[in-house]
A protein has these predicted regions:
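A structural signal for well-ordered alpha-helical scaffolds and beta->alpha junctions
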Residues: 3-10, 38, 68, 78, ...
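Active-site neighborhood of divalent metal-dependent phosphoester/pyrophosphate hydrolases
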Residues: 162-181, 188-246
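Long, structured stretches of catalytic cores involved in phosphate-ester chemistry, encompassing
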Residues: 1-9, 16-24, 57, 99, ...
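Short secondary-structure boundary/capping segments
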Residues: 2-5, 34-35, 63, 159, ...
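Active-site beta-strand/loop signature of hydrolases that rely on acidic residues for catalysis
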Residues: 1, 14, 39-48, 75, ...
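Metal-dependent phosphoester-hydrolase catalytic domains
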Residues: 1-55
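Residues at the C-termini of beta-strands that transition into short coil/loop
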Residues: 17-18, 28, 159, 171, ...
Length: 246
């Protein structure tokens, strides 16, 4: 300062370049050019801090829309990610599946779903979800965070000649998590293992907003071990109430 003929710099922004600095991305920077408002020029920096690795996934993935030849893996993240699913009949020789929309990966939302197809009926498969936070997504510049991976999970596809299976059906839970936990404990005590789980209405009641809906869905999915057991959520009359109703 002074602004029109600067002799000194009194504003600065500094970041100590250690390992933690890798978790910070500079989005933009500049100088506020307002000579009539001040006798010096303030500088600014817009930065983004990466999400902690253990907080990138909202919860475990869950299995949806299973058929004799495929399944959909769904999950939410706390930041937009570049994501894919590794899968195979073991955890060593695996393939990769990801979602493409008109030839591009849809990296613009925290809702993620990846379809795994062309599988063999009756086979057991293992899978895990991998993700990199999209820290910067510009036309000619991309910055991704480190790769975060879930634990390995598994599922078995139904075969056309399957005659017997076990389905567990919950309904009207109305956010009474203690009731669901008690019912799940009864199943465990009696050695009953579900091949499919159905939430038959009024299990995600009166969703207030997106965060509430995501939280409630993931509570149900964890309770049903939906990372390994395919689930179906059926809309009831209470799911269509409130401002974020389905």
């Amino acid at each position: 300062f002074p602004a029109d003929a600067p002799k000194e710099a009194i504003d600065y922004i500094a970041l100590f370049k250690n390992k933690e600095a890798d978790n910070v991305v500079l989005l933009r920077r500049g100088v506020v050019n307002e000579p009539k408002a001040s006798d010096h020029r303030p500088v600014y920096a817009d930065v983004r801090f990466a999400t902690r690795a253990d907080k990138l996934f909202c919860s475990d993935p869950y299995l949806q829309n299973i058929t004799s030849s495929g399944v959909r893996v769904m999950y939410q993240t706390n930041a937009v990610v570049h994501t894919w699913v590794e899968y195979g009949t073991d955890t060593v020789k695996t393939k990769t599946a990801r979602t493409l929309l008109a030839g591009q990966e849809p990296c613009f939302d925290i809702e993620n779903k990846v379809r795994i197809d062309s599988l063999e009926p009756g086979r057991k498969y293992y899978y895990r979800v991998c993700a990199q936070e999209v820290l910067l997504n510009e036309a000619y510049r991309k910055i991704l965070g480190g790769t975060v991976k879930t634990a390995w999970h598994s599922f078995t596809l139904p075969s056309p000649d399957t005659r017997n299976f076990t389905a567990v059906i919950y309904n009207d839970l109305h956010e009474q998590d203690g009731v669901m936990n008690s019912l799940a404990q009864i199943l465990k005590n009696n050695g009953i293992k579900a091949d499919l789980t159905f939430f038959n209405g009024d299990c995600v009641p009166e969703p207030r907003d997106r965060a509430h809906a995501i939280e409630r869905v993931n509570v149900l999915m964890r309770g049903a071990n939906a990372a390994d057991v395919p689930t179906f959520i059926i809309r009831g009359n209470h799911e269509i109430r409130n401002s974020y109703s389905a």
